[in-house]
């Protein structure tokens, strides 16, 4: 591997166990991290604003809940597990002014630091600890004595605590050392994560799925078949990719499918590459971040419009019917 990788045997769990951790936010990621840390014998408190709907849940699960300001003042390590677009207003008001030299503030995504939404005071460490998966998977894998890959990065050193040692120890406490903890930078994590979401995992995949579905519908094929071929079977391919890689996927599909994939890739390849380069450029030059923060400042008009319109599409209407048996089994 090009990146340095660390495992449980390389990391001292005692580093994070000796410190008081405060987690700001108690969504799926905050909850999973708090539970994993506690099960790893780490002292954890939760910071939430007054009136938060998560207060009762956190208390029910046995955590001490403080206001954000109080949490910052009483913690050695503060993890900001809030949505990216809220970092500036929350951290500037309730976190940054109360940080002291020697403390460490951590993030699960490099967005707000890389795009200068927050400025970390001198002497305060700034670390990234990013599990490569959602909170639900982070918790599930930990309970199975397994873990997710984690990324760590150091943006700024602490005047008191070794930031890298703290980041590694924190990742180990969440189960990351069981799988592997890779060291990168805020810039690389942020830009590659945004690119993956936009060009492949969310934007790219959704675009291909919806365009494929609509192409078959316009050609007169039944909605059910269009959904099966363009949406439903994505999971089968994704699972093969996840566990066996591209070559393994090729080995598990028919010659017809493999040859068809090669032929289809030829006309699509150049177009996709050019589009992806444009997407990456807008991420790198800050244009996407600017657009996203403007969207937030206007109360998400485009997101709200898109979400409402999506419910009325044929792909969602037939999908709801065909997914019903699977949801019922759960």
Swiss-Prot record:
User: What keywords sit in the KW lines?
Assistant: Amino-acid biosynthesis, Branched-chain amino acid biosynthesis, Magnesium, Metal-binding, NADP, Oxidoreductase
Can you give the residue ranges of the KARI C-terminal knotted domain? 185-329
Catalysed transformations (reactions): (2R)-2,3-dihydroxy-3-methylbutanoate + NADP(+) = (2S)-2-acetolactate + NADPH + H(+); (2R,3R)-2,3-dihydroxy-3-methylpentanoate + NADP(+) = (S)-2-ethyl-2-hydroxy-3-oxobutanoate + NADPH + H(+)
Q: Which residues are annotated as active site? A: 109
Cofactor section: Mg(2+)
Q: Where does NADP(+) bind?
A: 26-29, 52, 54, 135
Positions of Mg(2+) 2 binding? 193, 229, 233
Q: Which molecular-function annotation in GO is an example for this chain?
A: magnesium ion binding
- Keyword Amino-acid biosynthesis among record annotations: yes
- Gene Ontology cellular-component terms listed: cytosol
Q: What is this protein called?
A: Ketol-acid reductoisomerase (NADP(+))
């Amino acid at each position: 591997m090009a990146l340095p990788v660390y495992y449980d045997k390389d990391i001292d769990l005692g580093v994070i166990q000796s410190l008081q951790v405060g987690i700001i936010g108690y969504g799926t990621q905050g909850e999973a991290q708090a539970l994993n840390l506690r099960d790893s014998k780490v002292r954890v408190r939760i910071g939430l604003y007054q009136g938060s709907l998560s207060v009762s849940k956190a208390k029910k699960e046995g955590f001490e809940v403080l206001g954000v300001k109080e949490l910052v003042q009483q913690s050695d390590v503060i993890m900001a597990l809030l949505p990216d677009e809220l970092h500036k207003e929350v951290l500037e008001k309730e976190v940054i002014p109360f940080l002291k030299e020697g403390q460490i503030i951590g993030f699960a995504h490099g967005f707000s630091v890389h795009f200068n939404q927050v400025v970390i005071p001198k002497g305060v460490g700034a670390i990234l600890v990013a599990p490569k998966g959602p909170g639900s998977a982070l918790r599930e894998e930990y309970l199975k004595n397994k873990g997710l890959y984690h990324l760590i990065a150091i943006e700024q050193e602490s005047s008191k605590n070794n930031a890298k040692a703290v980041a590694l120890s924190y990742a180990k406490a969440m189960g990351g050392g069981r799988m592997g903890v890779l060291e990168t930078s805020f810039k690389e994590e942020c830009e590659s994560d945004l690119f993956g979401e936009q060009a492949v995992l969310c934007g790219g995949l959704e675009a291909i799925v919806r365009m494929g579905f609509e192409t078959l519908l316009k050609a007169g094929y039944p909605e059910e078949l269009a959904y099966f071929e363009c949406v439903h079977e994505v999971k089968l391919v994704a699972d093969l990719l996840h566990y066996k890689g591209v070559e393994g996927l090729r080995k598990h599909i028919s010659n017809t499918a493999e040859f068809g994939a090669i032929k289809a890739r030829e006309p699509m390849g150049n177009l996709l590459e050019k589009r992806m380069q444009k997407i990456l450029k807008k991420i790198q030059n800050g244009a996407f971040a600017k657009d996203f923060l403007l969207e937030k400042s206007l109360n998400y008009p485009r997101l709200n419009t898109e979400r409402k319109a999506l419910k009325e599409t044929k792909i969602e209407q037939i999908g709801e019917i065909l997914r019903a048996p699977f949801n019922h089994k759960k």
